[in-house]
A protein has these predicted regions:
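Conserved, well-folded catalytic cores of nucleic-acid-processing
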Residues: 12-15, 24-27, 46, 50, ...
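Helix-rich C-terminal "collar"/helical-bundle subdomain used as an assembly and partner-interaction module
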Residues: 6, 22-23, 100-102
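SF2 helicase catalytic motif II
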Residues: 165
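Walker B catalytic acidic pair
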Residues: 168-169
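N-terminal pre-Walker A segment at the start of P-loop NTPase domains
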Residues: 69-90
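Intrinsically disordered, low-complexity and often Lys/Arg-enriched segments
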Residues: 1-7, 124
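Interdomain "pre-motor" coupling segment immediately N-terminal to P-loop NTPase/helicase cores
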Residues: 10, 14-66
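Conserved P-loop
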Residues: 84-160
């Protein structure tokens, strides 16, 4: 169990505490250390869970989704969309090979819903960094950046993302 606590402390970047824990347990566990071990394990688990939730919350805000959508809310029965393909895409494995996904269809067919739902799945289940843009908003931001003589900042920001969603491409 000591290895688990030490590993957990290091994974939380608490290296000083990991070293102190190792020193405390080096000479064999005393009754005092053993009695506090369960508390430390629970605190580490709580901290790990809290950090994960805060990270997801931060990534969701950073993504700037127009609305929160998920795949459970999409009516596959009323659509011609291939449900199996969408579920396969929901793990965002296509981002590892830098492949693109293009959703094509008329107004009201669920393109934005699906793009948002796939992105939300990436953030919440696969720790992906996502940025959602209306294409018009992105073009306006790039123009503003150019006028301010600060070109390249948006491009650098987008390069750090695992997935960039460009919505409403047809309205350009």
């Amino acid at each position: 169990m000591d290895v688990d606590i030490k590993t957990s402390l290091k994974s939380l970047r608490l290296h000083g505490m990991a070293t102190a824990w190792e020193e405390l347990t080096e000479g064999g566990q005393t009754t005092r250390v053993q009695s506090s071990q369960w508390l430390i394990e629970h605190l580490l688990q709580a901290e790990d869970t809290n950090r994960e939730l805060r990270s997801i919350s931060h990534q969701m805000k950073t993504a700037r989704f127009p609305l929160h959508r998920d795949l459970a809310g999409f009516d596959f029965a009323a659509s011609q969309v291939d449900k199996a393909l969408i579920l396969k895409l929901s793990d965002l494995s296509f981002t590892q090979d830098a492949h693109n996904v293009v959703l094509i269809g008329g107004p009201g067919t669920g393109k934005t819903h699906l793009a948002t739902a796939l992105s939300v799945s990436g953030v919440t289940r696969h720790s992906k960094k996502v940025r959602f843009y209306s294409t018009v908003d992105l073009v306006n931001a790039l123009e503003h950046e150019k006028l301010m003589n600060k070109p390249g900042r948006i491009a650098q920001s987008l390069a750090r993302q695992d997935l960039v969603v460009l919505d409403e491409l047809g309205y350009l």
